[in-house]
Structure formats: structure tokens, C-alpha cells
Amino acid sequence: MNEGHAAFLTLERTSRLVRGEGLPFEAAREYVAATTLFTTHTPVPAGHDRFAEDLVRRYFGDAEEWVGLPWDRFFALGQASGGTAEFNMTYLAMHFAGYVNGVSKLHGLASQKLLHAFWPGLLENEVPIAAVTNGVHLATWTHPGVTRLLRGNDETVRPADFANAAKIPAPDLWRVHQGNKALLL
């Protein structure tokens, strides 16, 4: 799951197990968590969607029928322990994810600090938010014209080839850039 705004999908998955398979809510939630990874991208509070209870109730007031939970238990899925007046989509995602990660080591640390309230019994550095550093597949990411500038041929570019980037004559780099721009437009 990519960011908290996608967290409602976990409710649909849970509902299908509760209504379609006859599982009790907690068994369905555990199954969904065991098969869900949540990636948080935003290490600032403003980036985490939160909604007032009346708005959430308007769309999910039938939660007991839908997922087998009374309203107070349903609304608590969008909260850390202690609760607030708002339904937090990131907290909902974390209630249904067996693995949580940030998108870099630094972001993982920032997320541990920001989301620590979800795990009040843990020290901040024990908060189970891992870090996965995004990467690039150079062979498909690097345009053939840039590859030729870096390697002098059409062989697949390698990370070590970028050490030569500063040696590329500016007019040659500009020519390839403008050609790629023309192709894009």
C-alpha cells in the first residue's frame, strides 16, 4: 500500500473475508495484515490524511454490517492508542499492515519519530518502521544517447560509468539533452 490514502482498500479486503468467507473480524484483519506492506512517503504531519468523525461516519456508519465492528471499534482503527477526534489514514494503514517502511534510511528514522504514538510501549528507536531505499534500473532508465556519452558505445551503462560524467563536453551533453527533449515533446 502506497501512502495512507490507499488504506480503505484494507477495509474492502477485510469485508470480503468477513462477509464472503465468514471469518471473524480479527482473523480477517490478521490475514490482511499478513499480506499487506505499507510504505509511508511523507515524514511531516500535514502529509497524513485525517478526517473528522462525522465525515467518516457518513461513509462508514454501517461498519458493523460491513466488517462486523461496532462504530467505536471501527473508528479506533484510524487512531493511535489514546485516540483523537480525527480518523488518521496512516494509522488505519498501520493497523492492517504486517510491514511498514519509509523510502530511505533517514525517512525511516523520521517516520519512527513522527508515528511513535502508534506504538506507545516502545522506545522511538524500536518503532517497527523499516527503510527501503528506492533504486533505479540503469539499463532502462538511462537513454541510449547518454549511455554512448558515458561509455563510448551502446553497452549497458554501469554505476561506475557515472564517474566519467564530469568529463563529457558540455556541448555534447546539451545536444543529447535537446534531442531527448524533442522526442518527449
Where are the predicted features?
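Catalytic cores of carbohydrate-active enzymes across secretory and cytosolic contexts
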Residues: 1-185
